[in-house]
From Swiss-Prot:
Record organism: Mannheimia haemolytica (Pasteurella haemolytica)
Keywords of this entry: Exonuclease, Hydrolase, Magnesium, Metal-binding, Nuclease, tRNA processing
Entry protein name: Ribonuclease T
Subunit structure as annotated in this protein's UniProt entry: Homodimer.
UniProt family annotation: Belongs to the RNase T family.
Cofactor detail note: Binds two Mg(2+) per subunit. The active form of the enzyme binds two Mg(2+) ions in its active site. The first Mg(2+) forms only one salt bridge with the protein.
Cofactor annotation: Mg(2+)
Binding site for Mg(2+) 1: D26
Organismal lineage: Bacteria, Pseudomonadati, Pseudomonadota, Gammaproteobacteria, Pasteurellales
Residues noted as binding Mg(2+) 2 in the record, renumbered to the chain: D26, E28, H185, D190
Residue ranges constituting the Exonuclease domain according to the UniProt record: 23-198
Task of the protein: Trims short 3' overhangs of a variety of RNA species, leaving a one or two nucleotide 3' overhang. Responsible for the end-turnover of tRNA: specifically removes the terminal AMP residue from uncharged tRNA (tRNA-C-C-A). Also appears to be involved in tRNA biosynthesis.
Active site: H185 (proton donor/acceptor)
Length: 216
């Protein structure tokens, strides 16, 4: 028997996004070409529902990543993101350590939330985060990728719709989310702000009565 809207508990995350677990990711790179330029930093944050059915950040992971063999390093990109790839204090690990490490966190959250797959949430998801993540997956021949193969939530698009702003810092300002420009272009910091922004938009829609969907 098919569940009606009234029977579905939308305070459970598995019912909010059709069985998908939103996972916010961001990357820092040594260029703009996902196939040739190094992936240098990866951060991810899972989301959950609180007792009132509001979306909030949950677990996080963060990796500094060593350039893959033969990777291109663009000095201008390093100047932009402030990463010193030769600094031993980075504690950089290989892609084949970082990516599976993120998978472990995502699968654990999927099990806890009763979700079947993860779905990437990222700012400008179709460019840096999506392209570089997918390229790294292929390079290390990763097995059992927990994420949907093509569906993503792009917070730039969503923020343009909700707030009239597509730039992360400007969207956060409109959403009353503190943003420290000095910490921007750190994968972890940008992921934290993107997670807050996505949650704010989802929760705003809930408060405005736009979700759950109206019953017939």
């Amino acid at each position: 028997m098919e569940q009606t809207t009234e029977q579905i508990d939308y305070k459970l995350l598995k019912h909010r996004f059709r069985g998908y677990l939103p996972v916010v990711i961001d990357v820092e790179t040594a260029g703009l070409n996902a196939q040739t330029d190094a992936l240098l930093e990866l951060a991810a944050i899972t989301l959950k529902m609180d007792e009132q059915g509001y979306l909030v950040p949950d677990q996080q992971c963060h990796f500094h990543i060593a350039p893959f063999e033969g990777a291109n390093i663009n000095p201008e990109s390093l100047k932009f993101n402030g990463i010193d790839i030769d600094n031993p204090l980075r504690g950089a690990v290989a892609e084949n350590i970082a990516i599976p490490g993120m998978f472990i966190m995502v699968r654990k959250a999927m099990k806890e939330q009763g979700c079947q797959r993860g779905v990437i949430v990222a700012h400008n998801a179709a460019s840096d985060p999506g392209f570089f993540y997918r390229a790294a997956i292929k390079r290390i021949n990763a097995k059992r990728d927990p994420f949907h193969p093509f569906a993503m939530f792009d917070t730039a698009t969503l923020a343009g719709f909700m707030y009239g702003q597509t730039v992360l810092v400007k969207a956060c300002q409109v959403a009353k989310i503190p943003f420290d420009g000095k910490q921007a272009h750190s994968a972890l910091y940008d992921t934290e702000r993107t997670a807050e922004l996505f949650c704010a938009m989802v929760n705003r829609l809930k408060d405005l009565g736009g979700f759950p969907p109206l019953s017939d």
